[in-house]
């Protein structure tokens, strides 16, 4: 909201207004704000949870000192969700499709986890929400994200293609690129041009392989119209698998003091850096990685994510004063999965 407020006031020459246009400045503010919210608002939430006796039920796994944690407040993931949401609303570009998807993911997965914790704590049902329903709702989220990536015109990549020219100056487009705009930005001007074209793509970035890219259309056994449908079906299916796996994987990781929050913060730092690089034309070209317009906002969101987790770690590290519960772990995993897919 602050970002959009400064956009509305750009004609009034307010001192320091230009700083809000820098991703790095907004990322710093988002991180610090989320951390402070986790630290100070989190303390009040923990006291409220203790007062209401919203404690964790501990299963006896034979681990040393584990029964001492019985009664420790749970549902602390509310602290993380609150810090991320407020910081994101203040400093992110809310018109950006990537920001919208990540906010939706946070609320969706947080809602699943909150419902699960609520059933466990207030309904005194140790099983919580049934595994079937949790899985179904995660799969639904995967399809929503996948179909948005497939059909939303704002989610594109800039690909380099090679355009051959004959001696008489006639331009020949590569096979499958008959709709390429020949007036696209020319990168190298010689007998064979390297040009850039903004397109919908099923490519993803993979480290440690030549060219760093893998295209899911390579898995399609068909060509032409059926090939187009098949490659997107495979791509959406992979998105569903990644989101479901990340969400449940983080949920399983949340078994020791500070483990899920600490490791997720490290993952968030890496994703934030990669998102910033992918969203910057100069840096992505220099590092030979895919340029994805608009993903810089993911870096701002992940900064809020990191700040919220670091603030929460103050209370969650050993000896833990609060547990995040499924409210936090499912949301954290969903955020990691979706943000990794988008870059």
Where are these regions (language model features)?
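Alpha-helical transmembrane segments
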Residues: 2-46, 80-111, 118, 132, ...
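Short, Lys/Arg-rich N-terminal segment immediately upstream of the first membrane anchor
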Residues: 17-22, 69-70, 125-129, 226
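Glycine-/proline-rich flexible loop or hinge segments
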Residues: 26-33, 62-71
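Cytosolic, membrane-interface loops and tails of multi-pass inner-membrane proteins
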Residues: 45-68, 118-127, 190, 199-212
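ATP-dependent carbohydrate kinase catalytic cores
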Residues: 62, 67, 226, 230, ...
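Cytosolic juxtamembrane regulatory segments of multi-pass membrane proteins
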Residues: 65-72, 138-144
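A short, charged helix-loop
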Residues: 210-220
